[in-house]
């Protein structure tokens, strides 16, 4: 069976491929191989720039030709590496052999081929390639999409800034708020957590078989290989080298990235659930698209499917991020292989997250404000002004104001505008205080 949108096992590469396609450039098998080639090429160039004595004869003019190997990397190139891997049974060694073939094609590079992957272990390539792919996926896909979501929420927050709304705590009526402010809560939370994510350093392991530059030092003890590694990782890859490691990355900073992404997911889940609830409360209607069906049995249905889709995908993403976060920093002694297969799944939560962001945006852009329903709930809940009245009475040293309002409102009788006004008129306070109390309504008692 040929792999296509209908035969793919994962919905990320099947049903939702149209939403996740941009991530293929960072997390596909092709992308991983390309990143490995890039790191190997840049490492060789940096050895030439040092220079190692045996590499002094390399013409600097070939550097751009070398870089074109990964800049112009094709699916045919990736397939060649996979063919080599079928013999070597080692993915990174296959990249090394591929580059030696490319050196042969260039001509004049035969004396330098053994400096490809010189002194390195596979994880020096993997633990630079993967964080580099994550860095670029964040910058080029994730950040723009999450910032688009925040911008849409901010637009609504500003548009609805003056819309009073009954708040609900414990599912029960509470002091009124403003719809725009409630949306702004999510803007604030997302921006804060996004800033935290952006502050997480993306680090890489680069230090030989057990993190000590053993091979480098024994061959060239005169060079400061730690300084070399720091410079290479920072200047050529835009990452930060982990100073002390085993054979593999410590993954602590990558774990912090995943935890930060998970917190953003949590905020988005909260947001999607709230908008779902507001739709259920009829505070929003949804734009209807001709031809769409809401239920196979109930023709009238217009379901909040986009918010539900987002919530579901965010849950899957967070579950995987949690495993990545707690598993990757743990490895037996100087290294076991469990991180390798787990790390190949890094793109999966990214896929579910971008699906969720796009679904959230789609749901938000379908919303039609239903002020009638919002105002109806306010008009039917005059009990919420009790807090305002008792607070002013406290200010005036009125005896037992809380208890007086409790006796009025904590009953099974409906509290109406008339009953509140009757209570105010019966108070033993100055007329000026009564005037102050009379203007308080569920529509105006919304704070600042």
Regions found by a protein language model. Give the residues of each.
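Catalytic-core signal marking the mid-to-C-terminal active-site face
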Residues: 2-29, 61-71, 293-448
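Amphipathic alpha-helical coiled-coil segments and their boundaries
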Residues: 134-135, 142, 183, 250, ...
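Active-site-adjacent "gating/activation" loops or surface patches in catalytic cores
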Residues: 223-247, 251
């Amino acid at each position: 069976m040929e792999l296509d949108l209908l035969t793919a096992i994962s919905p990320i590469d099947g049903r939702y491929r149209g939403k996740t396609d941009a991530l293929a450039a960072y997390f596909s098998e092709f992308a991983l191989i390309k990143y490995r080639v890039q790191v190997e090429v840049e490492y060789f160039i940096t050895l030439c720039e040092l220079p190692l004595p045996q590499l002094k004869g390399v013409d600097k003019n070939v550097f751009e030709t070398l870089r074109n190997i990964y800049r112009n990397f094709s699916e045919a190139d990736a397939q060649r590496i996979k063919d080599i891997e079928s013999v070597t049974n080692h993915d990174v060694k296959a990249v090394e052999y591929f580059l030696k073939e490319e050196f042969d094609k260039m001509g004049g590079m035969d004396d330098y081929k053994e400096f490809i992957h010189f002194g390195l272990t596979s994880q020096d390539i993997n633990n630079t390639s993967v964080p580099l792919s994550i860095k670029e996926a964040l910058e080029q896909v994730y950040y723009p999409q999450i910032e688009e979501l925040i911008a849409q929420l901010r637009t609504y927050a500003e548009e609805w800034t003056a819309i009073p709304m009954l708040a609900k705590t414990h599912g029960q009526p509470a002091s009124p708020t403003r719809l725009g402010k409630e949306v702004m809560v999510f803007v604030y939370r997302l921006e804060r957590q996004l800033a935290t994510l952006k502050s997480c350093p993306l680090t890489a392991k680069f230090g030989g078989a057990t993190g000590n530059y053993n091979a480098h030092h024994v061959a060239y003890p005169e060079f400061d290989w730690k300084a070399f590694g720091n410079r290479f990782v920072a200047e050529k890859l835009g990452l930060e080298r982990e100073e002390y490691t085993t054979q593999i990355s410590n993954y602590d900073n990558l774990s912090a990235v995943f935890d930060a992404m998970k917190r953003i997911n949590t905020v988005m889940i909260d947001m999607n659930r709230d908008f779902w609830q507001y739709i259920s409360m009829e505070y929003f209607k949804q734009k209807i698209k001709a031809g769409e069906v809401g239920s196979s049995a109930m023709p009238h249905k217009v379901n909040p499917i986009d918010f539900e889709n987002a919530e579901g995908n965010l849950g899957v993403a967070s579950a995987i991020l949690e495993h990545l976060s707690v598993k990757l920093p743990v490895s037996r002694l100087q290294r076991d292989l469990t991180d390798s297969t787990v790390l190949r799944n890094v793109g999966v939560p990214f896929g579910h997250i971008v699906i969720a962001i796009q679904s959230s945006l789609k749901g938000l852009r379908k919303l039609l404000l239903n002020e009638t329903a919002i105002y109806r709930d306010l008009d039917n809940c005059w009990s919420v002004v009790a807090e305002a009245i008792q607070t002013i009475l406290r200010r005036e040293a009125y005896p037992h104001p809380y208890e007086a309002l409790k006796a009025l409102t904590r009953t099974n009788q409906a509290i109406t505008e008339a009953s509140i006004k009757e209570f105010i008129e019966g108070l033993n306070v100055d007329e000026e205080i009564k005037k102050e109390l009379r203007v308080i309504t569920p529509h105006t008692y919304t704070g600042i």
